[in-house]
A protein has these predicted regions:
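Short pre-active-site segment immediately N-terminal to the catalytic Zn-binding motif
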Residues: 64-81
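Post-HEXXH active-site segment of zinc metalloproteases
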Residues: 75-79, 91-122
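Surface-exposed helix-capping loop/turn segments at secondary-structure junctions
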Residues: 2, 29-35, 95-97, 131-139
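Auxiliary, metal-adjacent structural segments of Zn-dependent hydrolase domains
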Residues: 2-61
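Short, contiguous pre-domain boundary segments
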Residues: 2-5, 98-105, 145
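Long, well-structured alpha-helical subdomains associated
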Residues: 124-152
Length: 152
């Protein structure tokens, strides 16, 4: 099952959409989501001008992954999605409600949230790399077979 995409930003997602769904399917195969999230693409030009502005967030109440799109490379947006998909799984497992401080600088002040963030950073990047490498290997294999057939 693919995830729903909401394009509030009005950007052209044709090239990216196959990777959003493909990456989601790869993560689902590895993790086993009980419910798909909704991918929401948002525009915030003011945020885009900030060097350390927001890139994405996960809303555990609505199961939505929000991605800010302004001025970003598609692969960077996919990295944000990968990270937030891990938070989605953490939410489905009931692990996001750790209590403690949730305000500015929570990563430094809340060890429970810090551990969840570290998991999202490492596991999200790991699964995205697997997805990317599998696509590249599949493409190489198709090209090798084509070359082999052309030589006969």
């Amino acid at each position: 099952m693919d995830c729903k995409i909401v394009n509030n930003a009005g950007i052209d997602l044709r090239d990216m959409e196959q990777h959003i769904h493909g990456m989601y399917r790869h993560f689902d195969k590895q993790i086993g989501f009980k419910k798909p999230p909704v991918m929401v693409f948002d525009s915030d030009p003011g945020n885009a001008t900030k060097t350390l502005g927001k890139t994405a967030y996960y809303d555990p109440q609505t199961f939505e992954v929000h991605v800010y799109v302004d001025g970003r490379h598609p692969k960077d947006m996919l990295r944000s999605i990968a990270h937030e998909l891990i938070h989605h799984q953490q939410n489905l497992e009931g692990r996001l409600d750790v209590g403690g401080y949730h305000g500015e600088g929570y990563y430094l002040k809340n060890k429970g949230l810090q551990k969840l963030e570290q998991e999202a950073m490492s596991r999200g990047n790991e699964l995205m790399r697997e997805y990317e490498d599998q696509l590249k290997l599949k493409k190489e294999n198709k090209m090798s077979i084509k070359d082999w057939k052309n030589k006969e």
